[in-house]
Amino acid sequence: FKQKTAYEIGVRLVGSEMCIRDSAYTATAKAARAYLVSQQWDLGKKKEVDHPLDGGIGYGNRYPHSDLNNTLTALEALYYSRHLIADTPDAGKDLNWGAAIQFIQSCQNLPSHNKQPWASDDPAHKGGFIYFPGHSMAGSAKDKNGKTALRSYGSISYAGMMSYAYAQLKKDDPRVQAVFTWLSNNFTLKENPHMGKQGLFYYYFLMTKALSVYDVNELEVNGKKVNWRREVSMEFLKLQNQDGSWQNDNPRWWEKEKPLVTAYGIIALSFIHRGL
């Protein structure tokens, strides 16, 4: 596993029905799970959450720190494979979920739960997420108080919402409510909020998953109820290519690759279909 990134292992673990359901692959799946657990960051004093990067998971071999997107992928894999260690001696070797929650909120623009100096209560940012503590892919901006804030953006905010779901935070938790409010206030299908067309289809993909998992049927946007399932479905129909595929004109994060983006589309539509 050391030759693979934590991201690759997480995707393979959660995506392989054989690993999850077929007992012939249990040992391999448990080893993959244990590797992901071993990648949880613990800087500073060991077994204490005393650093903003503590509790998260990164690529494992690309750069030496955690980030929210890799943490989401790992949490998803660990959540759906948790039955592999239930009622076994390995149950005590699980992820430190409390530390994971601490890391997630350390990526959230929510001063009530995140005391880092960049966290902003300006409505333009409050409740949304950034990529990792101290860095936003959407850059920075002056908030209403003249302070430099790190800009929340769409796809990573849905990643934060989903991460809270896998950590089993309830819908009425103030951290979940805060990101839901930011996402509702910034709802659009024309762009990935604050990122333009970059990561647009990943934004759709995470949106459908997060809103489905938290059982959200409508969004309130500018005082009006929006049936997000219908709106997202219509946008996918409009953007579909003649050959049935989807593709982003913006190449960032491999979204010019039809197989990847079409997979995002199919999975997103499958979540929409389940909610009908």
Regions found by a protein language model. Give the residues of each.
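An alpha-helical repeat/solenoid feature that recognizes helix-turn-helix modules
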Residues: 16-17, 21-34, 38-234, 238, ...
